[in-house]
Amino acid sequence: MTPSELRRLYSIVRVLLSYGLDELIPKMRLTFPLRVGRRLLFWLPNRHRNMPLGERLRLALQELGPVWIKFGQMMSTRRDLFPPAIADQLAMLQDKVEPFDGKLAREQIELAMEGIPLEEWFDDFDIKPLASASIAQVHTARLKSTGKEIVIKVIRPDILPVIKADMRLMKRLAGWLPRLLPDGRRLRPREVVMEYEKTLLDELNLLREAANAIQLRRNFENSPMLYVPEIYSDYCRESMLVMERIYGIPVSDVDALKANGTDMKLLAERGVQVFFTQVFRDSFFHADMHPGNIFISYDHPEDPQYIGIDCGIVGSLNKEDKRYLAENFIAFFNRDYRKVAELHVDSGWVPPDTNVADFEFAIRTVCEPIFEKPLAEISFGHVLLNLFNTARRFNMEVQPQLVLLQKTLLYIEGVGRQLYPQLDLWKTAKPFLESWLKQQVGLPAVFRALKEKAPFWAEKLPEIPELFYDGLRQHKMLKQSVDKLAYELRTQQARQGQSRYLLGIGATLLIGGTLLLISRVEADMVPTGLIAAGIVAWIIGWRRTR
């Protein structure tokens, strides 16, 4: 390790120990190197003994900086690895840091515009940031060409070296973890860190965020449910994003929403509808829908509309995943646990040799107590969590797209019940899921699929005779190759058989001739002839094996 990495490692260890996070590892599970290391750092005591462990972990990550804050946010979605007391605290991590100098932001913008002065593109640039986070910060301005109000999101100039340095250190720590902790290998730390690095580097590319926002805006064009601000692509760069400025009420400000006369029940139900529409209709969902990224339009409070921003993280499901997920939800709420177990096996989420009866019993044991609550109080997100945790015992592989989905679903549920505590999520979602499933099966679905594929087959139709002829010719050539290979194999086997026969004869002649030669006092041509014949047989047999 380099001196700078050692200094950073020491500062990380100092923060972790000052919050007593060595308690995360039970003493009986500590390996010898960790026990020795802890004793050598005796001057770093736990200074926050009165705080719960989850809160201490959250505060420590916040103190360590942006890379660790975002890592904690990502790990908050892995509720299959952490108990609720820790996962809930990780979900509260706030990605807020001190803003950097607005003059430096201006320099970054002009650098992204290849040296063109900012005034040539924008008017009324506000040097004071509107918002600031660990990766980027936002400034307001107007487009010079149209006068429209915009916001400019610019990447922090000093963030990339920090990320690279901390990621190198994380990778080293991930390599040590399997040797230091008994369960380190099961947690797959290398894969976790690699996944995190990819997510973080994706967030540094604002062109990716711009493309996501454009797609989401297209999906909900003219929709009364969701509005996505316009992206001005001509001005966007990898380190700079320019979008329409919006005005709305933060979704977490319930008092302001009520004061504006918002229909809270309809607003909560629309949040659920927006989510399921993104997942099942569009196969493209905003996967970072925490309250800081959601606003409500001031207009038409009786017909409220969501406004979504910050599309840096999105998720998608393929057609099979969507079908299995919808059928899983319906089977679960119908208490058809056999169906739930079979769906997990059929989808490939668990190994095909899984004992379905045992799996069904495990699901029933975990999920049946959930129905002691009224349906309106049952959480979709926790249903998924319970199913995934049970499936992990049956060697379910982690499905990244489903982890993102579960995290987003928990966000949506939390927001919906904050807006309208009596929200019946199942009552809102069931008609949507049943309608979607009906569209996927039966004759209408077959005709629709044929209609969708018709242009493709119409284009390929003239090529079919030629493709058929090529197929027959290739089949003939393949048959000839197989016949030739079979002939060569038979010939080789025959040669090997003859070779083994000659080698055996040669060995017999050599041994017999040698014994005769030893037993006879006088020289005799017979033993010599036998030995010579044996040598000749060996040579011929050896040549046939080549």
From Swiss-Prot:
It is an enzyme of class 2 (transferase). Residues 124-502 form the Protein kinase domain. The keyword Ribonucleoprotein does not apply. It comes from the Bacteria. GO terms for biological process: regulation of ubiquinone biosynthetic process; ubiquinone biosynthetic process. Pathway: Cofactor biosynthesis; ubiquinone biosynthesis [regulation]. InterPro entries: ABC1_dom, Kinase-like_dom_sf, UbiB, UbiB_bact, UbiB_kinase. It is a multi-pass membrane protein. Keywords: ATP-binding, Cell inner membrane, Cell membrane, Kinase, Membrane, Nucleotide-binding, Transferase, Transmembrane, Transmembrane helix, Ubiquinone biosynthesis. GO terms for molecular function: ATP binding; protein kinase activity. ATP binds at L130, A131, S132, A133, S134, I135, A136, Q137, V138, K153. Its main location: membrane. GO terms for cellular component: plasma membrane. The active site is at D288 (proton acceptor). Its EC number is 2.7.-.-. The chain crosses the membrane at residues 499-519, 521-541. It is found in: Cell inner membrane. Pfam families: ABC1. NCBIfam families: PRK04750.1, UbiB. Is probably a protein kinase regulator of UbiI activity which is involved in aerobic coenzyme Q (ubiquinone) biosynthesis. Belongs to the ABC1 family. UbiB subfamily. This is Probable protein kinase UbiB. It comes from Pectobacterium atrosepticum (strain SCRI 1043 / ATCC BAA-672).
